[in-house]
Amino acid sequence: IAAISYSYIYFNSSYQKIMDKAKMSKAGRSSLQTIAKDLRNAGYKNINYTRSTWDRWIEKIDAHNGTKGDKLRIWYNISTQDRIEISYYLEKNTSGETYLVREVIENPVINPMKRNCERFDTQKNCAPITIIENATDFQVFFNDKDGNRLNNVNISSTENQSKVHTAEVYITVRSPNELLKNPITFEMLNGGIAGQFTKSDKYLRETFYISVYLRNVVKI
């Protein structure tokens, strides 16, 4: 009976690990595809758009909102009259765990209207969409045409925005369940003002990465 019980526990544990790793991989890769699509659109301006000054294309904010993660903001036209602002950043739940969200605002300069609301016209109960439920870290780096890191890329400096050639995005995803027998310390070494931080627990973590050529920003 003991042997059968042990075999069941081992099988169940192995199955859970396989399932969790598959969920982590799917979450990390699908979110990177979404972010990459927005990054490729960053800075796109319709030739007939004249509603506001074209001075914002891409921005990074270090250690956003009390987390160690970055905030990425992207702007581009979706029509001759409309522009959207898309933000990616970490939020904390009531347990203090972080998750990655995507927020979309239509015409952020002239008449800002958030998407994903219970009622769009009255902006009732608007909230960003969660794209990764268990995200430990979210980091963004901008590089110039020579591969050098760029700092202070924000809407207060169009000069720095125009220098961005590629963007690197790193997302660290945590397993939904505790899968390790003993706690392991994970150390995150981040740039900017975030610095390094550690997590010590029984969860698995995996970091997913993508580098994107900003085809529209390069043309500006």
Predicted regions: what they are:
Residues 124-220:
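Short linear sequence signals and composition-biased patches located at protein termini or domain-edge surfaces
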Residues 4-132, 144, 159, 170, ...:
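Extracytoplasmic beta-strand-rich oligomerization domains located immediately C-terminal to a leader/signal peptide
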